[in-house]
Amino acid sequence: MINIQLIMKTIVLKFGGTSVGSIDRIKMVCKIIASYKKKNYKVVVISSAMSGVTNDLVNKSKSISNNFDLAEYDALVSTGEQVSCALIAGRLKHIGLKSRSWLSWQLPIVTEGKYSGARISKINIKE
């Protein structure tokens, strides 16, 4: 018997802020993802924050301090992506697809440690 998992192709889909800018657009993104799943692709989704959210968060950090701590800045601005990813995962589950949003520390993704400019040095993925 052939293990279908071994012959599945993987595709990485990246959706920018405008494409996830509203709930209706997120639903459309989920239809796109579902279309790849129907073609037996393993799908990895990367999403930006909804349009305008990152700018709003940046402005909030500036209103708190013109010298905002970079570690806290990174924690703050990443929340926009977390919201988008959770909404996408929730919608995918609603339409019957297995889905899970992940935060970088849950994998974990290891960086060189430079806040607001770090490069990924390692991704620890366990099958």
Residue ranges of predicted features:
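Nucleotide/pyrophosphate-binding catalytic subdomain
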Residues: 2-127
